[in-house]
């Protein structure tokens, strides 16, 4: 008998209850006791098994992006970009690739409201013929920091106070006051887009700079953008309070019910493309995650569309055990030297092994759908039946060989080993440009959110003054208005 053919599955359900080992259970409502009112007997194995399984149902939640919802669908190429990449799933218009998407909030726990002001995760796993490609992004195109070394600190600052377990603005503003580059992300965070109406009306961004390579080996920097065809919609504070008070899972429910009703959400995928030889032409570093690439300088190019047309079958199996990883790339798409991306390439697999175990890639939602082969064996919860005798490479007893070489970026890297910030910081131009692009009422809401945050009692005069200095450098009138409402004199 091949045990791999008889894995536990709902398709093998019997019409009566059984133990985990398959033995029939004739009474699933009463414990085995001495008499009708006597003590429970330890030999009631079914009771012990049932309770012990129940107390182990929960796994560690994600350290970030714990609250989320998933859906399945497909990606379809609509425009030919083979001059930019040799990626197989982008080989021609009309090609479709199955995928799963997970939307999420970032900071709070698994059961937290979906109406809080918080960045949203926008992660896509495509099951391509050449392996899984994961694009693990957010609903903002920028991030608060530009170096992965700072990631634990910025998350700690946003997480609840370890003493009181209350999220407090003084901690956020204190930490990020040391990082003026964070102001550009605050121009999104404290903007109206800080609370999306739901997941269907939300943009997605790859955030990082990636590299595309064509079959000739030519490499270009790219950024990825997801644009919802139904438009972007956001909640103002009063709406968020009302909706969150009625339903803390409103975005999950909206996504699930929309797909169930046949109202399939759709996004268009666009890219921005930059020749690495031209990066010095701009006043920002293209590998800086705190910066956008202005679309008037580097226009969007259409690539394809994503349609979510199927709800997940089981929330735990396809949402909680779903493991996205920016290290999962395919030939034709590669990393860049973006410091945040480089750190994430290591971090995700590490946290998945902690949360799900060393064999998390064997779980159906994570496993590639294409043929694959490796010599990763055994470990906790390895449920794959393998009968090879050779578990090493190379071998004269096994004909496994190296794959055909595919193009990767080739360049010479020279320099002195050092820990340093990038040379081209330019921290205030982009947030100032964004602020000035808004209508007056939108500007006023942005100012009010800053005033509310900076008015918290534990935000010191020094921290307030620092932020007013940053806001003034972005836009003089912005800094003056915030300072005036706080009764503080600007230093610039």
UniProtKB/Swiss-Prot annotation:
Q: Record's superkingdom?
A: Eukaryota
Q: Which GO terms describe its cellular component?
A: cytosol; peroxisomal matrix; plasma membrane
State the family it belongs to. Belongs to the catalase family.
Cofactors that this protein relies on: heme
GO biological process per UniProt: hydrogen peroxide catabolic process; response to hydrogen peroxide
Record's InterPro entries? Catalase, Catalase_AS, Catalase_clade1/3, Catalase_core, Catalase_haem_BS, Catalase_immune_responsive, Catalase_sf
Q: What does this protein do?
A: Catalyzes the degradation of hydrogen peroxide (H(2)O(2)) generated by peroxisomal oxidases to water and oxygen, thereby protecting cells from the toxic effects of hydrogen peroxide.
Binding of heme: at which residues?
Answer: 348
Its main localization is cytoplasm
* UniProt entry keywords in alphabetical sequence: Cytoplasm, Heme, Hydrogen peroxide, Iron, Metal-binding, Oxidoreductase, Peroxidase, Peroxisome
Q: Where's it found, cell-wise? A: Cytoplasm, Cytosol; Peroxisome matrix
Quaternary structure and partners: Homotetramer.
Organism of derivation: Ipomoea batatas
Q: Give this protein's Gene Ontology molecular function annotations.
A: catalase activity; heme binding; metal ion binding
The annotated active site, in chain numbering, is 65, 138
Enzyme Commission number? 1.11.1.6
**Which EC class is this protein assigned?**
oxidoreductase
Q: What is this protein called?
A: Catalase
